[in-house]
Swiss-Prot record:
Name the record gives this protein: Snaclec 5
Function according to Swiss-Prot or TrEMBL: Interferes with one step of hemostasis (modulation of platelet aggregation, or coagulation cascade, for example).
Keyword Signal attached: yes
Classification via Pfam families: Lectin_C (PF00059)
Main location: secreted
Positions of disulphide bridges: C27-C38, C55-C144, C121-C136
Length: 148
């Protein structure tokens, strides 16, 4: 009887640890969870268009990074600083298809801004913690993001 209880308790502990809250388990392997979204830093340089295409191929609903508040920006900053040497990553913000009408590739509303004026695509300059316009044909590392 004691052995049965021990095994049952062990299975219960294993089940509870695997079930968790459910949210983090919906992230793919090597992706990080934050506030209902999964994020992954890619240390491979691509043009903005190629990076966005790559993100959409990773998971349904995945796009280049969109940022909506300073806390989210700080989370991404901490994730990328350790991995990337140049500290510049593509973001989903652009006006490639609709000049002067800025929007995120994931369709989210532009509700947080931190940039200098320039060209059609945006990068997040990690070391300076601000956004900057960049030529879309230049190559940079990137972060993909999707909603859990």
């Amino acid at each position: 009887m004691g052995r049965f209880i021990s095994i049952s308790f062990g299975l219960l502990v294993m089940f509870l640890s695997l079930s968790g809250t459910g949210a983090k388990q919906d992230c793919l392997s090597d992706w990080s969870f934050y506030e209902g979204y999964c994020y992954k830093v890619f240390n491979e340089k691509k043009t903005w268009e190629d990076a966005e295409k790559f993100c959409t191929e990773q998971h349904k609903g995945s796009h280049l990074l969109s940022l909506h508040n300073i806390a989210e920006a700080d989370f991404v900053l901490k994730k990328t600083l350790a991995m990337l040497k140049d500290g510049v990553i593509w973001m989903g913000l652009n006006d490639v298809w609709n000049e002067c009408n800025w929007g995120w590739t994931d369709g989210a509303k532009l509700d947080y801004k931190a940039w200098n004026e320039g060209t059609n695509c945006f990068v997040f300059k990690i070391a300076k913690n601000h956004w900057s316009h960049m030529d879309c044909s230049s190559t940079h590392n990137f972060v993909c993001k999707f909603r859990v």
